[in-house]
Every structure is written in structure tokens, then in C-alpha cells.
């Protein structure tokens, strides 16, 4: 239960585990139910295109997402993968949803074990492939 009193639906945890363990999905979108009492699965996708993920982010509404982000630092190191947690709260969204999503985020994050990186997006430049790549690769290869 979050500070806002919002709970995380079991289906949300299951969808995340299907992404993380079963590699069933490439990304999962989460939203608040109509009563604003529970974080539920809005959509799942196995589409490997990052652009397909970005197209699902609404211009005027908030949501959460997890994305199995694959990247490569150098040819010699091969591909890597990190699970990225997004809080999408565009500047154009109404104030009330932004407040509810901000205060409910920790409940969802706590329920999703295995998230490597968190990204807060208020516009598309903050969630671009390049911006996410920079964040996930920071420190990688320096171990």
C-alpha cells in the first residue's frame, strides 16, 4: 500500500515476473484503475522495437512502465539487458493524476524486484533511446 492508499494488483506483479523471468514480454504498461485504488496492467507487448514502446506513452496522461532494455557497450562485450522502470508524467497531464502517480510510485517499485534503473519522464526527450542508453550504460564496463 502506498502513501496514497493505492495497492498493487497481483496481475501487475505477475506481468512483471513474466517479463523478468519468462521473457514473455518486452514491456509492460501499468496504470491506476478507474477508482484510483489499484495499479493494474494496462498493456503488455513482446514487440522488440523501442519506438513501439514510446508510441504507447500518452501525450497527456500518466502511467508506469517496465521495459527490458537491451544494449551493447562494445563489440567485445556483447549484448546486455537491464530492466528499466519508467514513471511517465508528461508536463501536459493534469495536476491531480501527476500527484497520485508520484505518491503511488514507491508501492509499485517495491513490488517489482529486479528493476535496475529508474527513469522519470516528463517529455519524450527524457525517455529517448539515447537518454536511457546513457543511464543504463553509466558505470557498466567499469567493474
Curated annotation (Swiss-Prot):
Similarity field: Belongs to the actin-binding proteins ADF family.
Main location: cytoplasm
GO MF, one annotated term: actin filament binding
Gene3D superfamilies, A to Z: Severin (3.40.20.10)
ADF-H domain mapped to chain residues: 5-137
Keyword line: Actin-binding, Cell cycle, Cell division, Cytoplasm, Cytoskeleton, Nucleus
Primary role: Controls reversibly actin polymerization and depolymerization in a pH-sensitive manner. It has the ability to bind G- and F-actin in a 1:1 ratio of cofilin to actin. Binding to F-actin is regulated by tropomyosin. It is the major component of intranuclear and cytoplasmic actin rods. Required for accumulation of actin at the cell division site via depolymerizing actin at the cell ends. In association with myosin II has a role in the assembly of the contractile ring via severing actin filaments. Involved in the maintenance of the contractile ring once formed.
GO BP terms in the entry: actin filament depolymerization; actin filament severing; cell division; endocytosis; Golgi to plasma membrane protein transport
Chain segments annotated as coiled-coil in the UniProt record: none
CC terms in the record's Gene Ontology section: actin cortical patch; cytosol; fungal biofilm matrix; nuclear matrix
InterPro entries attached to this UniProt entry: ADF-H, ADF-H/Gelsolin-like_dom_sf, ADF/Cofilin
Protein name per Swiss-Prot or TrEMBL: Cofilin
Amino acid at each position: 500500500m502506498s502513501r496514497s492508499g493505492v495497492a498493487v494488483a497481483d496481475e501487475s506483479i505477475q506481468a512483471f515476473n513474466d517479463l523478468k523471468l519468462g521473457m514473455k514480454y518486452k514491456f509492460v504498461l501499468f496504470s491506476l484503475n478507474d477508482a484510483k485504488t489499484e495499479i493494474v496492467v494496462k498493456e503488455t507487448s513482446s514487440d522488440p522495437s523501442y519506438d513501439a514502446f514510446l508510441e504507447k506513452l500518452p501525450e497527456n496522461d500518466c502511467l508506469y512502465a517496465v521495459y527490458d532494455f537491451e544494449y551493447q557497450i562494445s563489440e567485445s562485450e556483447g549484448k546486455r539487458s537491464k530492466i528499466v522502470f519508467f514513471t511517465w508524467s508528461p508536463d501536459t497531464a493534469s495536476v491531480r493524476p501527476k500527484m497520485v502517480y508520484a505518491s503511488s510510485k514507491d508501492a509499485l517499485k517495491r513490488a517489482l524486484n529486479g528493476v535496475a534503473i529508474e527513469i522519470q519522464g516528463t517529455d519524450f526527450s527524457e525517455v529517448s533511446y539515447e537518454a536511457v542508453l546513457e543511464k543504463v550504460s553509466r558505470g557498466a564496463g567499469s567493474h
